[in-house]
């Protein structure tokens, strides 16, 4: 069986592709740049042809929130690119798995279900939602598609907005928390998402749109306190009053702080998911999300100079 993985140089694919190959699948990695697991170099915003037969396509390639590229670049990759990959899936009659994002919901009340109203905030969420709508168009014409709305994906090797927190932990500096820190903020261990993608190979769920938000976590205060202990740091949590959120959003817009307006709209609220539909597929989470953050902190400390650039 042949599986095409787009975004083969990306974070999720780096864990997914070796597992697929170990299980005996023929894997075609596709990315716009060369990489360890990339066999086809191609800009997915352009028409795509693959000579090989393809049974499953796992579409991971996307411009991400923290890349802060132009709206046009977001649309070219996340919307036009998704349609090009769907065209390929249609020509191969391949089962298509689209990894979308829980950011399509905006910042609603928790727990969030698949019936929660969609309200995408920002170019990333909007373009991923548009990608979902294109998937539905192909699904209506008979293509087998599963849409996974994933929460933030964390694990060893990824730092993103957390590298500032990790540096503060290393320097025994304050850990800033927006609001009182009693809110629960959900995220996904990368290995859980990888295992679910592999699970879908034997347990196809065409027509399913499902949230994949990770186990319901502890509060932000509890999570950061665990990291302080794990990192043997003398850092302390400092709470930032919500009255200053307007200033933080301005600083984010000016790219002075390493977060986006969407991050600021959710990080002080409960943001977690009802897992009933996911569990009905037969899959259960296998990894503790806090361990993903601990792995990231370990990675940061072991690769400090390199990590600063990631």
Predicted feature locations:
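N-terminal Rossmann NAD(P)H-binding glycine-rich loop of SDR-like oxidoreductase domains
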Residues: 3-23
């Amino acid at each position: 069986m042949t599986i095409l993985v787009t975004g083969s140089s990306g974070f999720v694919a780096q864990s997914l592709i070796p597992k697929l190959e170990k299980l005996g699948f023929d894997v075609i990695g596709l990315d716009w740049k060369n990489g360890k697991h990339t066999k086809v170099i191609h800009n997915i915003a352009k028409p795509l042809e693959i000579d090989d037969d393809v049974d499953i396509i796992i579409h991971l390639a996307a411009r991400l929130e923290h890349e802060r590229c132009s709206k046009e670049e977001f649309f070219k990759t996340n919307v036009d690119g998704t349609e090009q990959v769907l065209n390929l899936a249609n020509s191969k009659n391949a089962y298509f798995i689209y990894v979308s994002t829980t950011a399509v919901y905006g910042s609603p009340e928790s727990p969030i279900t698949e019936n929660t109203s969609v309200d995408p905030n920002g170019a990333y969420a909007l373009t991923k939602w548009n990608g979902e709508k294109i998937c539905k168009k192909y699904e209506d014409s008979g293509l087998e598609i599963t849409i996974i709305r994933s929460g933030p994906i964390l694990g060893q090797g990824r730092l993103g907005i957390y590298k500032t927190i990790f540096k503060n932990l290393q320097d025994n500096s304050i850990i800033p928390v927006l609001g009182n820190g009693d809110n629960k903020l959900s995220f996904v261990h990368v290995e859980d998402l990888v295992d679910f993608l592999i699970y879908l190979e034997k347990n196809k769920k065409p027509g399913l749109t499902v949230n994949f938000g990770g186990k319901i976590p502890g509060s932000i205060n509890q999570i950061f306190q665990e990291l302080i202990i794990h990192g043997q740091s003398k850092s302390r949590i400092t709470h930032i009053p919500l009255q200053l959120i307007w200033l933080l959003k301005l600083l984010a817009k000016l790219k002075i702080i390493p977060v986006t307006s969407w991050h600021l709209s959710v990080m002080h609220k409960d943001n977690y998911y009802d897992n009933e539909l996911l569990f009905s597929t037969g899959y259960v989470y296998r990894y503790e999300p806090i361990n993903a953050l601990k792995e990231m902190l370990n990675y940061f400390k072991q690769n400090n100079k390199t990590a600063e650039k990631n």
